[in-house]
Amino acid sequence: MLMMYMLFIMMKTYPMLSYHMMSYHIMLYTIMWYMKYSTYMRLWLLYKSYFIFIFIWTNNNYNNNYWYVTMLMNTYLYYNMNIHFLTINKKFLYSL
């Protein structure tokens, strides 16, 4: 319950935050989407995105010299945004 309240506050205060907080903005919506699924699916998603979560947690660092790292990160972010907006419950969207 406390975690949900913290998520709500962070979502509400996002426009006042700096660009440095974008990774947390992505994380919150990704976690909300991820928590809807069964334990087996959650484990599978974590397995598929293991390395990407490291980059997201480390300030979403694009300043690297490895082309495959950037490609994986962009793929992760692109598909997660699409999945989020396709699966979001409208009653939560309207309450923001």
Curated annotation (Swiss-Prot):
<protein>
    <recommendedName>
        <fullName>Putative uncharacterized protein Q0032, mitochondrial</fullName>
    </recommendedName>
</protein>
<dbReference type="GO" id="GO:0005739">
    <property type="term" value="C:mitochondrion"/>
</dbReference>
<keyword id="KW-0496">Mitochondrion</keyword>
